[in-house]
Amino acid sequence: LEYNQDNLTDDMWGYNRYTKQEVRIASAFFQNEWKNKQWSFLLGGRLDKHNMVDHVIFSPRANLRYNPTENMNLRASYSFGFRAPQAFDEDLHIENVGGTVSMIELAKDLTEEKSQSLSISGDLYHRWGDFQGNLLIEGFYTSLSDVFALRQIGERDGIIINERYNEKGAKVYGLTLEGKIAYRSLLQLQAGVTMQKAEYKQARAWSDDETVPMEKKMFRTPNTYGYFTLSYNPFVPMTIALSGTYTGSMMVEHKAGFIDKDIAVNTPDFFELNLKAGYDFNLYKGITMQVNAGVHNIFNAYQSDFDRGAKRDSGYIYGPGMPRSYFAGVKLSF
């Protein structure tokens, strides 16, 4: 059994917006698992009563595992989830679009967003002398109904009002590959890539300009993204870490103001590479001091087309969070 309560008060006198929200969620969770060395089957569910939803929501889940060999795991899982029709952090943000402030309001008939997810995966392990490796292959499919979306419904006191409402549905599906290989305690490499497609079940209008084409694809969801981390310990106190993140091209909204007309922009892809080196000093009886330094975003992969001026679209931001930067630090461990 579980009970959560959250009280939110957010008053913006300058914009004449006052938010007072009380969220109460009473939940009960149950599950049972049957297993032996080769098989396992888990069946469970969760009951949630949210004070902003007029009915109890049942969220079932199931998981099946099969181990044909000691070094192979095969899994299939199903789960149901929901998101309540309440104000979240992003709904409280104020944006500047074309010199005009925009805010988000919840539609009066907003209902909960529901999701059903299915995944199938294979997990392989192997050892070759001093090397050991792991490979994960996973396919996934998620169907969303009554999905939350935004639409511009007009202006009030010079403020653009965007309404959060329920779209008919959306789906996200794809494939994830992840691998790890290690050589003793000297070297470890881990990498992964996800190829996916995320789209609404019907094309939707995202601009109040009727001449702007509707879009079926979800904004800010790249079809491909991935990462890698490489750690090297040449000797015990010294650690060198190289990491990278790849973000494929995605579609982003660009609102008029700095530009003449709303457009959907296909962004370039980005590869962000980071390097960090650290050295540990044993100071006294279990007290360790680490001195580290490195570089974030070595190749300076960064957005190059920011809007400027009073009429800029403050929401038109994508890609890595910072340009190339250098850092140094000291950490004490007790």
PLM segments and residue spans:
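Transmembrane beta-barrel strands of outer-membrane/channel proteins
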Residues: 1-5, 43-47, 76-80, 89, ...
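Surface-exposed extracellular loop regions of Gram-negative outer-membrane beta-barrel proteins
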Residues: 1-4, 19-51, 55-61, 65, ...
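Residue-level signature of outer-membrane beta-barrel architecture
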Residues: 32-36, 47, 66-67, 80, ...
